[in-house]
Every structure is written in structure tokens, then in C-alpha cells.
């Protein structure tokens, strides 16, 4: 299984060649967080009449995992450790990372939002945009 951040889903939808190749080489099933589903949809809204269901169907092959209390507690523990190290992450990114961690799968991202030493010790994170 492969866990995709919204940045990767967006790049896949846009056909970014290196991202598409990397993800397809990993194989299905593709998983994501329900937070990522919202982030992708949020990037498409604004007309007042956006077909949200159609937007979601564009990446319908990616199964969303719901947030639950265990994931929220895991994210809280991660934030506690980060803050002890003098760092802090956005709540949404921690919820995504905690969801990925709950699966034990590689978290594939295409931005620098997940680059902390602690996080990379807890979750197998691959950043396809290492220079971001």
C-alpha cells in the first residue's frame, strides 16, 4: 500500500511525470487521509457551483482513511515530541502523518511540510520535491 499526501495527489492529477512514475512504480492500493481529500477539493472550489463529487471522482482510485480518536491521539503525541525538540507542525500535517503512520505505509509527499528529524524517525516519508 502507498499513502499519498495531497501534494502528490495534485501532482498526479496534473500529470507531473516524475511523480506519476514514482507513485505508479509503488503500486496500488493508494491510501490518503480524509484531510488530504479536503485539501485537494479545496484547491478546486470557488465558483459557487463546483461539483464536489466530480472533483473527488478525479482521484477516486485513492481510498481515504477517516480520522479517528487513535489517529488524533497519535498526532498529539507527535506534536508533543516535536515541541519538546523546539519544533511545531501544522495540525493538518500532523493528522496526515499520524494517519499514514497508523497504516505503516510509506508517506509520499511533494513538498517540505513533513521534513523534521523526529517525523522522519517515526514515519517513512519520501519527499519527491527534496528541494522544497
Enumerate the language-model features and the residues they cover.
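Histidine- and aromatic-rich ligand-binding microenvironments
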Residues: 4-5, 32-33, 89-90, 111, ...
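Conserved glycosyltransferase catalytic-site signature
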Residues: 6, 69, 91-94
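A generic structural signal for short hydrophobic patches within well-formed alpha-helices
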Residues: 9-10, 19, 37-40, 72, ...
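Acidic, metal-associated active-site segment
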Residues: 40, 90-106
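Acidic, PIN/NYN-like endoribonuclease modules and their adjacent C-terminal/linker elements
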Residues: 101-132
Amino acid at each position: 500500500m502507498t499513502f499519498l499526501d495531497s501534494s502528490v495527489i495534485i501532482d498526479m492529477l496534473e500529470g507531473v511525470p516524475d511523480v506519476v512514475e514514482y507513485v505508479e512504480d509503488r503500486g496500488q492500493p493508494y491510501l490518503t487521509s480524509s484531510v488530504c481529500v479536503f485539501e485537494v477539493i479545496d484547491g478546486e472550489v470557488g465558483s459557487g457551483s463546483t461539483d464536489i463529487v466530480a472533483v473527488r471522482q478525479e482521484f477516486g482510485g485513492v481510498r481515504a482513511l477517516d480520522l479517528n480518536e487513535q489517529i488524533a491521539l497519535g498526532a498529539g503525541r507527535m506534536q508533543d515530541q516535536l515541541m519538546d525538540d523546539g519544533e511545531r507542525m501544522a495540525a493538518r500535517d500532523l493528522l496526515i502523518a499520524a494517519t499514514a503512520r497508523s497504516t505503516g505505509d510509506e508517506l509520499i509527499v511533494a513538498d517540505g511540510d513533513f521534513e523534521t528529524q523526529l517525523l522522519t524517525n517515526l514515519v517513512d516519508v519520501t519527499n519527491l520535491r527534496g528541494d522544497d
